Amino acid sequence: PLYDKAHLLRIVEETDDYDELNAFFNDRKVNSLLYAIAMSENVSSNDVPFGIIKKIIGNTGGVVMDSCGNYLFRDRPNTVRIFMHADKNIRIENIMKYLGISKEQAEKEIETEDSKRYEFHKYYTNEIWGMSNGYELCLDEGILGIDGCVKMILDYLKIRNLI
């Protein structure tokens, strides 16, 4: 299955974990810290939301989008960590087309989202978002296209005997 933010939140919607996971995804860092203080435990900022995600996914596997998945499952031997990127101009064109916005709005959207992702990843993992050493595969969607990226990922999974 695909586990993106929306799917993970739907899974925990009716549970006590919803507020914590929602805060994690919306970058409200204070909740985990307050939880740790209230519980008088030595809990790091990522223990609570990462524990929830690990509980949801268990040992079944799947695709985890965003959510620091490359860090979260780094100790599992069958984890494949993939980072897809593209040239900024290609990203701008894609955002303009997808959201129906101007070039200036698309540039601002990309800058805002990239900054959020960078800060989010740094806060929860102490790693730099997008650095190649955090991933096994770094694929340039602008060069390969979506279909080319999918083919490379599938070929890689076959080489690793994961499919």
Spans of model-derived segments:
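ATP-dependent small-molecule kinase phosphotransfer cores
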Residues: 3-61
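Small-molecule kinase domains that catalyze NTP-dependent phosphoryl transfer to phosphate-bearing small molecules
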Residues: 21-32, 40-43, 103-147
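Short, amphipathic alpha-helical "lid/cap" segments that border enzyme active or binding sites
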Residues: 50, 146-154
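RNA pseudouridine synthases
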Residues: 56, 68-75
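Conserved nucleotide-binding/hydrolysis micro-motifs of P-loop NTPases
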Residues: 69-70, 86-91, 143-145
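Conserved phosphate-donor/acceptor-positioning beta-strand/loop module used by diverse small-molecule
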Residues: 75-99, 103-113
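C-terminal helical "lid" subdomain and adjoining coupling/linker elements of P-loop NTPases
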Residues: 160-163
